[in-house]
Amino acid sequence: MGWECTTVDVNPRYEPDILADVREMHFKEGKFDVIWASPPCEHYSIAKTRGARNLPLYDSIAQACLRIIDEVKPLVWIVENPMGLLRHRPFMSGLKKWTVDYCMFGAPYRKRTDLFMSDNMSEGLSDVLCDKTCGQVDKAGRHMNVCQNGPSSRKPGAAYIGKLDSRHSVPPALCVGILIKIESIISNQGAEDGEHPGGGKVEGTPHG
């Protein structure tokens, strides 16, 4: 689609364009047209049933993502995180949110996910939650796969998706739908400004 993308991550295994901690980063206003942030989700996850949660650490990362968005003031921004405790943190209050089940976009598991986003992205969107027509449920109406690293006590007998990259991935169909809407927003903005639409700069922040 003609996008120039810059990836940011603290983990070298993902080979990001910028290897850094987002809490130590600053960008100038207008640096990126679009920002997609996926702050780490493990300690926000409702699937975490062992060990203490380090919410101060995870909050500091999520807040850094929001700070960068405020600094850059991109035309479009999205903060992605599996539905869990992040939606209840005080600093997320008031942000527009779109909630989707990944199984409705072709994923082999439900993985209900919150997408916090700029007002222009949220316009016209309704939550897309599983209605049992996703093709991933058994005869009892339960999802056959669980997106977590280990068996689910809540769903005995369900298969689990243990590979890290698989658990972190966003369904391609959902990505395409989001990109189409972003293209429309960028094109409309370009027409209003008298500029030639197309292309753009995108930033991605750490995996969640």
Model feature map: region roles:
Residues 1, 207-208:
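Accessible peptide chain termini
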Residues 38:
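Residues lining the SAM
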Residues 25-31, 41-206:
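Class I S-adenosyl-L-methionine
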Residues 1-29, 34, 92-99:
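Adenosine-cofactor binding site in Rossmann-like domains, unifying the SAM/SAH pocket
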